[in-house]
């Protein structure tokens, strides 16, 4: 979920970055595999990068809605349903890096007690965490509150472990176009093999829909935004 950029992330283009790095590697006579990642949604996208000199590609978003993915199935439905305006890039991570996530993530704004004693993955070299500082600030401001709300940071260690922060890729809103909906309104989960094969064999930017487990209510691509 961390973007690796500042809040000016939208000014950068993956194809341009890959071209610049490839040119630099060639100028320095460095034989280092170049593997782009981020927004590569179809096999055609992947082929374009390989033809531009990439050694391979890294993909993730489409696999979040596969049966093999470790996310709970109900949360996978949140990924399917998400539209562009349901997703934000924020700075609530204690690392300070921007993260992209679904706005309805229950961990956003939650004031859970810090769990650094149990996890503490993000503590700095002095044992500090930006969430602890934010939590203590809210605790001092609202000493009698039964439940705190911390808006500017999140207890990332705990919420990621408990599937309460739903980080996602920039093409998440397109996931609904990769599946079909059952009569109950739920999107059909895909198999990792189906997604992998689609990356291998899709052409002209097309996405292969799965064979429906039951008669679909409507093709997913007909959903209103």
Regions found by a protein language model. Give the residues of each.
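Conserved active-site-proximal phosphate/metal-binding subdomains
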Residues: 1-33, 41, 48-225
């Amino acid at each position: 979920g961390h973007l690796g950029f500042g809040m000016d992330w939208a000014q950068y283009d993956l194809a341009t970055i890959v071209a610049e790095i490839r040119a630099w590697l060639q100028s320095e006579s460095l034989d280092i595999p170049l593997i782009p990642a981020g927004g590569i949604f179809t096999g055609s996208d992947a082929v374009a990068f390989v033809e531009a000199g990439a050694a391979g590609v890294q993909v993730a978003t489409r696999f979040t809605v596969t049966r093999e993915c470790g996310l709970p199935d109900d949360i996978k439905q949140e990924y399917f349903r998400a539209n562009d305006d349901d997703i934000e890039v924020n700075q609530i991570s204690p690392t300070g890096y921007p993260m992209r996530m679904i706005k309805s993530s229950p961990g956003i704004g939650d004031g859970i007690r810090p769990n650094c004693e149990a996890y503490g993955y993000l503590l700095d070299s002095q044992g500090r965490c930006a969430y602890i500082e934010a939590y203590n600030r809210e605790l001092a401001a609202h000493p009698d509150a039964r439940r705190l709300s911390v808006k500017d940071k999140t207890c990332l260690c705990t919420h990621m472990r408990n599937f309460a922060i739903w980080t996602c890729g920039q093409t998440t809103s397109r996931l609904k176009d990769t599946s079909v909906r059952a009569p109950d309104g739920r999107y059909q989960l895909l198999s990792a093999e189906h997604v992998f094969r689609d990356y291998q064999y899709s052409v002209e930017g097309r996405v292969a829909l799965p064979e429906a487990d039951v008669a679909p209510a409507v093709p997913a691509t007909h959903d209103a935004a």
